Regions:
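N-terminal mitochondrial targeting presequence
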Residues: 1-31
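Extended amphipathic alpha-helical scaffolds
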Residues: 23-70, 74-81, 252-415, 604-631, ...
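Long, basic N-terminal domains or extensions that often function
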Residues: 26-78, 83-259
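Flexible, glycine/charged-enriched surface loops at secondary-structure junctions
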Residues: 29, 125-134, 168, 237-257, ...
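Glycine-rich, flexible beta-strand/loop modules in the N-terminal catalytic cores of phosphate-handling
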Residues: 50-134, 140-142, 205, 223, ...
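Stable alpha-helical structural segments in soluble proteins, enriched in small hydrophobic residues
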Residues: 121, 152-164, 226-229, 233-237, ...
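Mobile "lid/hinge" segments at catalytic clefts and subdomain interfaces of large enzymes
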Residues: 164-295, 491-599
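Conserved structured catalytic cores and adjacent interaction surfaces
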Residues: 436-439, 443-556, 561-674
């Protein structure tokens, strides 16, 4: 049977079927010197059938990145047109998985967090005119236990997207560590563990697309030095990527089949629906929606729920008007157009009146309150109210044997004793979803921000396992950083040893996008972004970029910057956002320090003993798992943890007791008993 008959029963209407032909590949290699290490960028040698491929090496670390775009236009929601998947293989370090089937299973938290970081760094610079979904696959081919993979993954993904022609300009990434007032570029994992601060910076020629900072209470001046140092190295990486990309011919998306063409060929599939607003559509949406939108944003007496319901009504009414006049306007397109209009309206209303939608000034934070020990059976609990945002944090403390060995083959094992989870059900933002309690990339990423904010002030000698759970009961913006202060208070209520109290806040910037300027015939040059402290939900979802910051009275512990739309912010704008946020944090700490806490009775103190096992006997130690270990634990009233690499840690009430248990275990190994 012919291909034409398979596609449409012979009804081709005289149209010739065009097949995608990949561009001719040439091998290009570039080396960038970064401090004491060299970053090798290659393309054109591996994965030649992909739209774009990149091979990145640093030391023994090797990452393969491939980029593919869908061959047909997307007709569903494309709020996240870039999908990133990062996978680690135990074979990258010459190991065999210890799972029953001896292969890797689902995504680990490390893989989810790395995928999320890469996606956040690159999504803002994806070509908005591209109607095709893009997928980036990152695979760890060879591991270097002295180097982390985050920045190499961003560089590999950016180069692959650049070769594929689906990104506006290359993005480079680098890690900077502050070790004893000395800045180290791309530090080793051991150096990062002892560093006073570390910064993951991703950006292009004009500014930053992602900033991830965690430190042991660093000052703003030290942070600024790290930002400028990182920016100078990123520019070199971006230039090297641009030189490589210039050697490849990008395949134009118009050469692929669109939905209209496939529909004419007889395939039963949905017609193409554009999702990028045009100037004419933006003008029409503004004419229809502007009066009601201004009323919603200027009514300071309205509640958060009232504003959300008003926005939903506005979206429905605007859609009803526009979809009644044209069959080519989708609801997704209307939503995107409204988002662009809202950014400009927020900007204009604040410029005109000096007030925001809830009546506050641009740099005014909401009043906050904290109530501790509201859950009697929980070790520690705190309810925080920040305007109409409510966060309930609960803390449980257990024995240290409940800690987990993390890292595994790839990153080196370490003992994690603080576990943070963050959840925001759909009811918190007055919506309904198919599954309200789904824990995915977003939740893992938000929990990591809270963990990075609090962990620098934890006492390293605290020998207990801590679980902190943050429930966002209602969210009118700032739902992540609003959980930092109550989380700290809940941990203190549970008896956790902390050096100082921590608080967090968010700062976002609103600025009319380039599309709006073009629609109005204005110029974007010279337009400064407007900073908004402690944003509401509407402001948070319709800003250009947002910065989350946490810190103590002594210094900053965490910073996270995300670019949502528009051009990347330069470093001087980031400095202004940091100053505004940290000033607010120090003011909020005055309120938090006044909260009185009566700690619960601490858990019985226990002793830890780590046993050094010769490399030749580690397999025998692993084989002891089961009844033999259970008998030893029962006999000596202790807990024994054995990792997949044969590392043994014993927990008990006395050191003599643990010494006897370890001797018994080693005797079993010597006798060869399992």
């Amino acid at each position: 049977m012919s291909a034409s008959r398979l596609l449409g029963g012979g009804r081709t209407h005289g149209r010739t079927l065009r097949l995608f032909v990949a561009a001719t590949r040439t091998y290009v290699r570039s080396v960038v010197e970064l401090g004491q290490s060299s970053l090798v960028l290659e393309s054109g040698n591996l994965a030649r059938l992909a739209d774009g491929s990149a091979f990145v090496q640093m030391g023994n670390l090797s990452i393969l990145g491939t980029a593919m775009r869908r061959r047909m236009e997307a007709f569903y929601s494309r709020r996240k047109p870039l999908l990133v998947d990062y996978r680690e293989r135990s074979v990258a370090v010459g190991k065999i998985p210890i799972t029953q089937k001896r292969r890797e299973l689902g995504f680990s938290d490390v893989e989810l967090k790395t995928s999320s970081i890469v996606q956040r760094a690159l999504t803002p610079l994806m070509n908005q005119e591209n109607q095709f979904d893009v997928q980036v696959l990152l695979t760890l081919l060879s591991s270097d236990r002295n180097l982390d993979v985050e920045t190499s993954c961003i560089n590999a993904a950016s180069l692959a997207l650049g070769v594929a022609g689906t990104i506006q300009e290359p993005v480079g990434a680098v890690c900077i560590a502050n070790i004893g007032d000395r800045l180290v570029v791309n530090p080793s994992i051991d150096e990062r563990s002892v560093a006073d601060a570390e910064l993951v910076y991703a950006g292009c020629r004009t500014g930053a697309t992602l900033v991830q900072f965690r430190g042991r209470e660093l000052s703003t001046s030290e942070l600024n030095d790290m930002l400028y140092e990182a920016s100078s190295h990123v520019i070199k990486i971006v230039k090297a990527q641009a030189d490589i990309i210039s050697n490849f011919d990008q395949q134009a998306p118009t050469d692929d089949l669109s939905y209209e063409e496939i529909f004419e060929l007889g395939v039963k599939i949905k017609p193409s629906i554009k999702v990028i607003p045009t100037k004419e559509l933006l003008h029409t949406v503004r004419m229809v929606a502007a009066p009601q939108l201004s009323q919603i944003l200027q009514d300071s007496e309205s509640s958060a729920r009232g504003r959300l319901e008003g926005m939903l009504r506005l979206e429905r009414e605007t859609g009803r008007v526009l979809m009644g006049n044209s069959e080519y306007v989708s609801r997704e397109l209307i939503t995107r157009s409204l988002n662009k209009i809202v950014v400009g309206e927020i900007h204009d209303n604040i410029r005109a009146s000096g007030r925001r939608c809830d009546g506050r000034k641009p740099l005014e934070a909401r009043a906050s309150s904290y109530e501790c020990q509201i859950l009697p059976e929980v070790h520690g609990s705190t309810l925080a109210e920040l305007g109409e945002t409510q966060v309930l944090c609960s803390c449980a403390v257990g024995r240290l044997d409940l800690s987990m060995m993390r890292g595994g083959y790839i990153r080196g094992e370490y003992l994690q004793s603080l576990f943070v989870t963050w959840e925001r059900p759909a009811s918190a933002i007055a919506t309904v979803t198919n599954s309200s309690f789904y824990y995915g990339k977003l939740e893992v990423d938000r929990a990591e921000l809270i963990h990075s904010s609090i962990s620098p002030v934890m006492d390293q000698e605290y020998s207990y396992t801590v679980r902190l759970h943050c429930d966002v009961l209602s969210s009118d913006g700032n739902g992540v950083m609003a959980a930092v202060a109550p989380g700290v208070l809940a941990m203190l209520s549970a008896g956790v040893a902390l050096k100082r109290r921590v608080s967090g806040t968010s700062v976002c910037a609103v600025k009319r996008t380039s599309t709006e300027f073009e629609a109005e015939g204005e110029e974007e040059e010279g337009e400064e972004p407007m900073l908004i402290l402690d944003p509401t939900l509407i402001e948070e979802e319709n800003c250009c970029y947002i910065l989350n910051l946490a810190g103590t009275e002594k210094g900053i512990t965490m910073i996270s910057l995300d670019l949502l739309t528009g051009k990347p912010p330069p470093i001087d704008v980031i400095e202004d956002m940091v100053d505004v946020a940290y000033t607010s944090v120090r003011q909020e700490l005055e309120t938090i320090n006044e909260v009185e806490i009566v700690p619960r009775k601490p858990v019985d103190e226990e002793v830890k003993l780590e046993v050094e096992i010769p490399e030749g006997s580690r397999s025998k130690i692993i084989a002891l798992r089961g009844s033999s270990i259970s008998n030893i634990e029962e006999q000596f009233d202790c807990q024994i943890n054995i990792s997949s690499r044969g590392r043994v840690i014993l927990y008990g009430k006395s050191e003599d007791q643990l010494q006897e248990a370890s001797e018994t275990m080693l005797n079993l190994v010597a006798q060869g008993r399992a």
